[in-house]
Amino acid sequence: MTNFDADTLRELRDVQEVAIRTEKHPKSAVVIWVVIADDEVFVRSWRGAKGRWYRDLSAGGPATLEFAGRRLPVRALPASDQAAIARASREFLRKYQRSSHAQEMVRSETLPTTLRLEPRSGIRFDRTVG
């Protein structure tokens, strides 16, 4: 497993929302939530398996996260073990507890859409989003 550096993890912990662009649909970014649990980066589709960005990523397609003036190339792996899914759920509820949508992120139909993100190797991180 490849993971993000400490600065990237800190920035992702602090940011409330990120934009995600899949390589299949590079012209349209979707705003999503991201959490860090045990230094692993997780995302989840509140629309369940219907979310287009989720379908693109779960099919193995690459994507880019945009946040805090950065472009971060990522790839996704299904979070298949129940312990990781539970850790991610706790973090979604903790981080987004003030949002009325937080409970939607831990519904039974959204849990299978939990993805663990990793940096795409050999891709430079761009600090200028514009």
Per-region residue spans from a language model:
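Aromatic-enriched hydrophobic runs in primary sequence
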Residues: 7-9, 19-24, 40, 67-69, ...
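Short secondary-structure boundary/capping segments
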Residues: 9-10, 33, 105-107
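Short beta-strand segments
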Residues: 14-47, 55
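Extreme N-terminal tail/first-helix region
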Residues: 1-19, 125-127
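Short low-complexity stretches enriched in small and charged residues
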Residues: 1, 25-33, 68-75, 129-130
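A generic local structural motif
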Residues: 4-7, 29-30, 102-103
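Short, structured beta-strand-loop surface elements
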Residues: 48-123, 128
